[in-house]
Amino acid sequence: MGLIATLPDLEIVFVFSDINDIHTDFKPILPIMSDLSSIETAEGSSQANQINCVKTFEDLFSTPFHGDVNALCWKRELIGDFSEIVNQVELNGNMAELNQEELCELQLSRQGKLAREILLNDMKILKDHGASPILNLIKCYDRDDSYPFFPTDVYSFHVDRSPVATDTFLCTYQGEASEIIPNSQAIQKVLVPEIRDELKKLYDGAEVGFESFLTECFFDLHYQAKPNAQTINLGLGHLWKLAVDHPGSKVLPCVHRAPIEKNGQIRLMIIC
């Protein structure tokens, strides 16, 4: 369980990405945004079919993905002041990890202490179940400007991949929340003709090796939203389990991305 490996600017499992600048006129499709409450009432929709909500962590951990379901949510209404924790931590750079010792040393009000207890408990139950949770403070992620026609940073819709069976767990406590999209409403970027043509220019090798090139460079992990796609905001305080692309997986991996942060706002989230 947990992340296998990441690039500094990627929030995905086991993803590695001097490619000359390629300038194209591709324009991103802006999906429609949905929240979790609207999904629960949209019976029969692709969003509702993708998500199952559970009532306990044990259910979240033990419930298998099946059919179209590749996102499980332990929906919670959290108490406490998480912004107090964020405001007490000096962030040197765009993001930093807050370890348990540093968290416990913070001098907090009653509301801040309530928030801290939730963070400590979430980290404990994840560790107890074999995960390696990381508590991150995020001002923003680094942008990938190496190849403008195909950015591979976390703001791009992508799936996680692992050589072993695993799931991705995450929860946002403060700031903008992560987003997912139903697989039926997204297309692999490597299948978009214009993008595929540009990738072939980058590859510049024998046709027989092109598909291996896409996999080895992890271009095949990234997706583009279809017209009128409905992006689902994961909300604050809810602990999520997302399906990962791994050998033996019985469902499609969950397509997700990091949100665009609001100026001056810092995200507080756990991921593993």
Give residue spans per PLM region.
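Short, structured patches in soluble enzyme cores that scaffold and shape functional sites
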Residues: 137-139, 171-174, 182, 244, ...
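Extracellular-facing segments of soluble proteins and assemblies that are Gly/Ser/Thr-biased and enriched
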Residues: 108-160
